[in-house]
Amino acid sequence: MRDNTQHLYNNFELRKLLIPIIVEQLLSSLMGTADTMMVSNVGSAAISAVSLVDSINILVIQALSALSAGGAILCSQYLGSQNKKDANRSARQVLFVMVILSVALSAFCLIFRDPLLHVIFGKVERDVMTNSQIYFFFALLSFPFIGLYDAGASIMRSQNNSRNPMIISVISNFMNIGGNAILIFGLGMGVEGAAISTLISRIFCAVVVIWQLRNDNEPICIRNYFAIRPDWDLIKRILLIGIPSGIENSMFQFGKLAIQSTVSTLGTVAIAAQAMTNILENLNGIAAIGIGIGLMTVVGQCLGAGRKDEAIYYIKKLSWLSEAVIIASCLLVFALTKPITMLAGMEPASAKLCFFMITFITIVKPVSWVLSFIPPYGMRAAGDVKFSMITSCCTMWLCRVSLCIYLCRVWGFGPIAVWIGMFSDWTLRAIIFSIRFHSRKWLNHHVIDN
């Protein structure tokens, strides 16, 4: 253990933690795009079904990811305080909670699968609904494995091991692409082939991450999984952190769906331009999001060690790093936008509109995005999750959703209204979270017993 005259993390240790997370986020996004492109070759009914069901999948994945992060915060703080015993106890409860919740969710949705699809999507073409039912069935089977992987990967990152989750994720993504090629093109299984391939890759992730948690060379080692029993005090702490974060992530997805329904009324040119802009905007933010995920581990361990000044220092340090990364990413994506729209075969009108929106994003995103997202990652690691949830939900519905709908439907703005709303959301969040950060009230939470 370092003495108090040294920083808890040196630059080499930060790179070792952050780079694998960034690579994992980037490759997962690129592989997801490739996966969608492969499924699109099956036909319009297939791609429509996958797109519809994926909107549910993303909602579930984000909620489970937030819950597992709640447990990882406990683990990282206990490890920071050199309390390996309670870190291991917390890790076991994270796995327990994630298995119970994901299995219950999967079972509920399996029982009410058809009514759920009809309620959520309403009247769609028969072929689309048939394909949706097939794809949704296999997606539901994968929920427990998503929960297990999210829990295991979060536990690994909490002990500064981000390399193993990256390797698992990369291998599983290539497995998914290979499985699609065999089952969709080789065996002609269509949507069912895509769903089975995804299920197999998720089972692989869960099995490998659970196996790797048995490594007794790591601070957290879990061996006898079937002997895990509920510890209600720890479960309560996990849920107190995880549930607000889960609600926050879920609300973002609902907001996206509301915006998507508004854009869908603007015509095919706007829809195509907005779809490509979404992909490119997501791409230029991935590296900074990876830094934010790593920041949660760093701040958690600092606070566990009782070094609040270090937590403040690293939030500032990694926010500056994120700003540099965002500027570089925005400029790179801006330079690649025209070649990408040409390779994608977009219509000239859609390509022109996409380039206009990316130009706007390149200008405004470096101004406020980092302050609106990166410090909150660190403050959540301190247990400041309710403030983050309330702020994020309010600014999203007030600015991102309401302003977008108002500008589109009242003033006749095109899809640029989405990004005006987004920028106003980022700016308001940045102001509120900056005030919160400098108030130091986020440091008053007690996630673990000292």
Predicted regions and their residues:
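Short alpha-helical transmembrane segments in multi-pass integral membrane proteins
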Residues: M1-I21, C75-S142, G186-I243, V299-K365, ...
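Transmembrane helical elements of multi-pass membrane transporters/channels
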Residues: K16-D35, F138, S172, S201-C205, ...
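N-terminal transmembrane alpha-helices
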Residues: Q6-M37, N41-V42, I58-G70, L74, ...
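Helix-terminus/linker motif at the lipid-water interface of multi-pass membrane proteins
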Residues: L26, L30-S48, L117-R126, I182-M189, ...
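Small-residue-rich hydrophobic transmembrane alpha-helices
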Residues: I47-A107, I146-P165, I271-T337, W369-C393
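Short runs within selected transmembrane alpha-helices of multi-pass transporters and secretion channels
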Residues: S68, F138-R157, P165-N173, A194-V209, ...
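Residue-level hotspots within the lipid-embedded alpha helices of multi-pass solute transporters
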Residues: Q25-S29, Q62, S102, S106, ...
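Transmembrane alpha-helix boundary and packing residues in multipass membrane permease domains
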Residues: I21, Q25, T36-M37, I73, ...
